Amino acid sequence: LRLSLFQVSVGMAVVLLNGTLNRVMIVELEVPTWLVALMVALPLTFAPFRALIGFRSDTHRSVLGWRRVPYIWMGTLLQFGGFAIMPFALLVLSGDTHGPAWIGHAGAALAFLLVGAGLHTTQTAGLALATDLAPEHSRPRVVAFLYVMSLVGMVGSALAFGALLENF
């Protein structure tokens, strides 16, 4: 159950990226829809690297002797880095600054890219760790449970973000 919490965080990040920031950028900041769609699609560019991340976490041991956990840490740090850059990129996109607009677009694109890389890295290494720890006869149930927890994270965070942002 504790190992499934990374899937909840992945679900929350997906809702934050695809739902909340999408609406904020289009409605409040009046960023062109095609540009927002491109930024929302940026995290998917890291999807093909999941096989490489999985292979690397299968074969490479870190300095501490761990295989999966450093990838989960790195993915979490990438997610955090992207979400840390995002508010500043949105401030520049709002037009209340003296800098050129392309800096805000580049910052938002970088933030979306970092979050996407973190999502895929965390999810791939976490699923691999769960299958390593689970007995062979229960692996399908463990993977199914992890995906259910991802959906729980998506639904729960959508309800929470919706309630918190109701006045906006």
Describe the residue ranges of each PLM region.
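Membrane-embedded alpha-helical bundles of multi-pass transporters/translocases
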Residues: 1-168
